[in-house]
């Protein structure tokens, strides 16, 4: 049976977004947890709740994303608190979007295994890349220094353990053209008709 709901996951800088961009270019619907999170940040109630949870991360009475980021990536209990608050809200919106689509739909879910959300999907595609390539990618994309990138990576699922999960592992160790070919191969493996 062809899977309908497919998660795309992987650690920071692994190439999830590039892989999902390829799927979009091919014509498939793709939703992103990061985009949904950005939408939630425009919700006044959401931000007020965060302000109450993290009062030390306020600047002029408003939650400061940079302060919050520094706090949660240096304090594992703060990260757990943030994830316990935000992940259910993100996943609720994500599933509502996905359930409205007839046929195959993809979702970029960065912390899929960490949140235990893999059971919500018919199939999982996991991107993997060397740590050095990931560090370089996040430096160019986000301006994170090596220590910040490594700190964030350490809070995520260990890429070496992906074989223990029921997922298709895509090694993102070449250029974008090779990743495109790997995306086509994954679609064939999942028996998804290419658009």
State each model region's role:
Residues 11:
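P-loop (Walker A) phosphate-binding loop of NTP-binding proteins
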Residues 35, 39-102:
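ATP-dependent small-molecule kinase phosphotransfer cores
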Residues 8:
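Hydrophobic anchor at the beta1->P-loop junction of P-loop NTPases
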Residues 93, 119-120, 140-190, 195:
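Small-molecule kinase domains that catalyze NTP-dependent phosphoryl transfer to phosphate-bearing small molecules
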Residues 93-99, 104-140:
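ATP-dependent NMP and nucleoside kinases share a basic, alpha-helical "lid"
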Residues 17:
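Walker A/P-loop
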Residues 14:
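ATP-binding Walker
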């Amino acid at each position: 049976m062809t899977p309908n709901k497919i998660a795309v996951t992987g650690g920071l800088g692994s190439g999830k977004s590039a892989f999902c961009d390829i799927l979009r270019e091919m014509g498939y619907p793709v939703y992103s947890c990061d985009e949904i999170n950005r939408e939630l940040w425009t919700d006044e109630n959401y931000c007020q709740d965060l302000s109450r949870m993290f009062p030390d991360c306020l600047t002029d009475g408003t939650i400061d994303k940079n302060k919050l980021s520094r706090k949660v990536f240096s304090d594992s209990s703060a990260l757990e608190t943030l994830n316990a608050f935000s992940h259910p809200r993100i996943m609720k919106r994500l599933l509502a979007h996905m359930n409205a689509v007839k046929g195959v739909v993809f979702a970029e879910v960065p912390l899929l295994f960490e949140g235990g959300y893999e059971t919500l999907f018919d199939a999982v595609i996991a991107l993997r890349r060397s740590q050095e390539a990931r560090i370089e990618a996040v430096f160019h994309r986000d301006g994170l220094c090596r220590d910040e990138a490594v700190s964030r990576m350490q809070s995520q699922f260990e890429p070496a353990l992906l074989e223990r999960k029921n997922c298709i592992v895509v090694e993102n160790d070449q250029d974008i053209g090779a990743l495109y070919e790997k995306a086509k191969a994954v679609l064939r493996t999942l028996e998804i008709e290419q658009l």
